[in-house]
């Protein structure tokens, strides 16, 4: 974000403002793609217009150059142009610093950038607008300054006249014949007194001149401060004018309408707060029931995870038995009877484990069935009555669209819960059938292997 105190103007507005200030060189094409020669010429015109100093006249003055230097160096065109560009850069830096741009440098003259040139010219336009707006306020300061300058010129005239008188008396003072030493001393004393008075007058003039410069700086600072204060006061005045033009009868009527509307809204707010409290009680009851349902579903999910784990163990055991069967076939095909006995013992152990696992599986199935029946009874005996009581309480308290939405969500939860129960029953039945088929298949395979 830019930290400048003036706005960055668009090219069209910038060109219009500069041309209105008699800067005929201000063209959009030249500003968008500035060259070194173009910006130097344009800045010279700006300095000449606003500072009253022509850079070409100032830089062409031979007194600006060092007379003690070499004549060859002074007559070198490159040296002369360099000094002129440096002097122009110094003048432009001081001017742009006074109007709010403190980073002007030599690159803005030699290799100008379109964005920086646009920024510098925006500062010039802003200064021109401010100067035009505040020119009337400066009239009294300019008149006072002119008066002080006239007094200063009068003092300098008096000083020059006294200096001429001193020089005249110095030339006339000569030793004349017949004059005594005492007469010369008296004349010298008289001249010393006049010189002392002149020195005092000179010091007074210097003090007055310094006071004038300080007063001038103070007045310029006050002018700038008063200008900003005037802008702020004008803004405040415009706001107060808007308020002063307001119709008080209409304002009182609007206040009465707003008061009536406020009372109505307050009544509606109280009714809504009562409904909100009742709805919060119903929501707390519903959340309690939801947590209980979540606990039931969590128990069912835990049982399903255990069943899946057992099924995975059975699948692993099946894989092991298939591997054992394959190894057994390899041993039988090789005719090694010793390995046959070892495998027979392993097979017996696997049968024992299988029978034991079958018993545990059946016991777990019975336990899961009992748990499921218990959960169903708890749901029927505890959850359903609470849900019905909550439904009756909600229907009695509030009969709006929000409660109907909650009824619909509760019915959806019931259906989802019933669907999950049916899915669990189906999964248990499928798991039992798979286990039974697997056990029968394993027994058949073992019988075939032993036979």
Swiss-Prot record:
GO terms for molecular function: microtubule binding. It is found in: Nucleus; Chromosome, Centromere, Kinetochore. Residues 157-368 form a coiled coil. The keyword Aminoacyl-tRNA synthetase does not apply. Keywords: Cell cycle, Cell division, Centromere, Chromosome, Coiled coil, Kinetochore, Mitosis, Nucleus. One of its GO terms (biological process) is cell division. Disulfide bonds: none annotated. InterPro entries: Kinetochore_Nuf2_N, Nuf2_N_sf. One of its GO terms (cellular component) is nucleus. It comes from the Eukaryota. Pfam families: Nuf2. Belongs to the NUF2 family. Component of the NDC80 complex, which consists of NDC80, NUF2, SPC24 and SPC25. Acts as a component of the essential kinetochore-associated NDC80 complex, which is required for chromosome segregation and spindle checkpoint activity. This is Probable kinetochore protein NUF2. The lineage of its organism: Eukaryota, Fungi, Dikarya, Ascomycota, Saccharomycotina. The gene is NUF2.
